[in-house]
Amino acid sequence: MDPAHHIKDTSAELLSQQDFSILQSRLLEFLASQEARETVTASKELTLLRQGIRQLKEKVSKMEPEEMTVKEKKSIIEILKARIALKKAFLKMALSESNDTVVKKEDVRESPVDTFMENAT
């Protein structure tokens, strides 16, 4: 095969620290707007975050493992670990908020299905 045949501009396909920095800042913006209960802003940030993740996944899927540098592989692992940690923290926060909001049975209206099921037993 002709070696010149394999030469291509891969700068757009290579992972860069900027790719990860952008995702991290978008994630932080989303979490901040979520915490502040700014629904519209959180929705926009989540959309941008999803787009960024999709673009990063496309870049990674097009790369051969041997094309990735050790630094890129470590960066991907760190991002995945951070995502897992953030998901755990978010779920823990949501769980603690749901435990703080205790609903009394008399405050909840029974649905017709619940009434039917109680009467059937």
UniProtKB/Swiss-Prot annotation:
GO cellular component: mediator complex; nucleus
Region named Disordered: 101-121
A GO MF term: transcription coactivator activity
Compositionally biased residues, Basic and acidic residues: 102-112
Highest rank taxon of the organism: Eukaryota
Protein's GO biological process: positive regulation of transcription initiation by RNA polymerase II
Protein name per UniProt: Uncharacterized protein C24C9.04
